[in-house]
């Protein structure tokens, strides 16, 4: 097997075993060691909790005021009927919700096939039993189906309902995921001389509203879209911050008073409009000696003070004075 030791193997879809119309086993290999569990667990969590689908959210049954009751002529109590309604597998085409109706009379089972609905609604499990009638009794109900994602308990929706919610409208815990069961297994795989690789086998059962293969494809798409944000991190470059050096030595921006010259020397400099040390160092000895009342003694004092600070007379400063000082002058 050729390639860099740091290069990751790219898995391929090896086999799709269609166990039944709603169950399939999907095998992918080879995976780098440890990636079987990494990808298997991520896909499993998405398939169970993040896949969009349709579920029953509300039910109204004629003659029933609350879920903790029973209905004459029906074998099951209301809680059991609600539990059975949660098992309906519904497909909505081009809409996010629909109202279904069910009316049945006479002894026998009541199934999903007895539900009346529009043409853009499909029930994938028409043989699903909702309840059983005894004797010459009947049952009528209205069932609301909505599109959603994940699991939404009835208690969470009840908090958002208005206080004037009609008596008899029963809220149902909604599990929107079309995946009924998902399990994965990691087995050993081999490629040429490498025997430390993984094989991922995903065993999944859906409620019939989506093919198992399509469910895995959608879950992988969701995972890839979420990881896109991390991929983009490699393109974000932090600009290198260059240390900005000051245009002039800070000491040149200080006033000449900081030199602590004698009063005579300081007054002579101020008379010549020499306010900053940067102004002073640009003057030559000849220029300073032409200053009224500034003799050789004062000149020597100025030269010694500047020398103690690493400065001297006759220096050339480009772009002097800086804008910050020019505004003050």
Curated annotation (Swiss-Prot):
| Pfam families assigned | RNA_pol_A_bac, RNA_pol_A_CTD, RNA_pol_L
Alpha C-terminal domain (alpha-CTD), as annotated region: 248-329
What UniProt keywords apply to this chain's record, in alphabetical order? DNA-directed RNA polymerase, Nucleotidyltransferase, Transcription, Transferase
EC main class here is transferase
The record ties this protein, via SUPFAM superfamilies, to: C-terminal domain of RNA polymerase alpha subunit, Insert subdomain of RNA polymerase alpha subunit, RBP11-like subunits of RNA polymerase
Q: Name one GO cellular component term.
A: cytoplasm
Which residues does the annotated region (Alpha N-terminal domain (alpha-NTD)) include? 1-234
Which EC number applies?
2.7.7.6
GO biological-process terms attached to the record: DNA-templated transcription
Molecular function, one GO term: protein dimerization activity
Q: Which domain of life is it from?
A: Bacteria
Q: What is known of its domains?
A: The N-terminal domain is essential for RNAP assembly and basal transcription, whereas the C-terminal domain is involved in interaction with transcriptional regulators and with upstream promoter elements.
Instruction: Report the function annotation for this chain.
Output: DNA-dependent RNA polymerase catalyzes the transcription of DNA into RNA using the four ribonucleoside triphosphates as substrates.
Per UniProt, subunit arrangement is: Homodimer. The RNAP catalytic core consists of 2 alpha, 1 beta, 1 beta' and 1 omega subunit. When a sigma factor is associated with the core the holoenzyme is formed, which can initiate transcription.
The similarity comment for this entry is: Belongs to the RNA polymerase alpha chain family.
For this entry, the protein name equals DNA-directed RNA polymerase subunit alpha
């Amino acid at each position: 097997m050729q390639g860099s030791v740091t290069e990751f193997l790219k898995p391929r879809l090896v086999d799709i075993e269609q166990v039944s119309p709603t169950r399939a086993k999907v095998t992918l290999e080879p995976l780098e060691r440890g990636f079987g569990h990494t990808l298997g667990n991520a896909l499993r969590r998405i398939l169970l909790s993040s896949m969009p689908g349709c579920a029953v959210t509300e039910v109204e049954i004629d003659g029933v005021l609350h879920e903790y009751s029973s209905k004459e002529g029906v074998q099951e109590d209301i809680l059991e009927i609600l539990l059975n309604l949660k098992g309906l597998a519904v497909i909505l085409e081009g809409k996010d919700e629909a109202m279904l109706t069910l009316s049945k009379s006479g002894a026998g089972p009541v199934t999903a096939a007895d539900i009346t609905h529009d043409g853009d609604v499909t029930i994938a499990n028409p043989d699903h039993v909702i309840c059983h009638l005894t004797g010459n009794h009947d049952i009528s109900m209205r069932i609301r189906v909505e599109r959603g994602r994940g699991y939404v308990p009835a208690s969470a929706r009840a908090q958002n309902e208005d206080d004037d919610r009609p008596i008899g409208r029963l809220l149902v815990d909604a599990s929107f995921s079309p995946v009924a069961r998902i399990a994965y297994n990691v087995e050993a795989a081999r490629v040429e001389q490498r025997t430390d690789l993984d094989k991922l086998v995903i065993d999944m059962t859906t409620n019939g509203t989506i093919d198992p293969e399509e469910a895995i494809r959608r879950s992988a798409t969701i995972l890839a879209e979420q990881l896109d944000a991390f991929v983009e991190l490699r393109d974000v470059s932090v600009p290198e911050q260059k240390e900005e050096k000051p245009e002039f030595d800070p000491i040149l921006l200080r006033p000449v008073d900081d030199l602590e010259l004698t009063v005579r020397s300081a007054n002579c400099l101020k008379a010549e409009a020499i306010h900053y040390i940067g102004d002073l160092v640009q003057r030559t000895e000849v220029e300073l000696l032409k200053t009224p009342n500034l003799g050789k003694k004062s000149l020597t004092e100025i030269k010694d003070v500047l020398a103690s600070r690493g400065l001297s007379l006759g220096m050339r400063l480009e772009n002097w004075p800086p804008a910050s000082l020019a505004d003050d002058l």
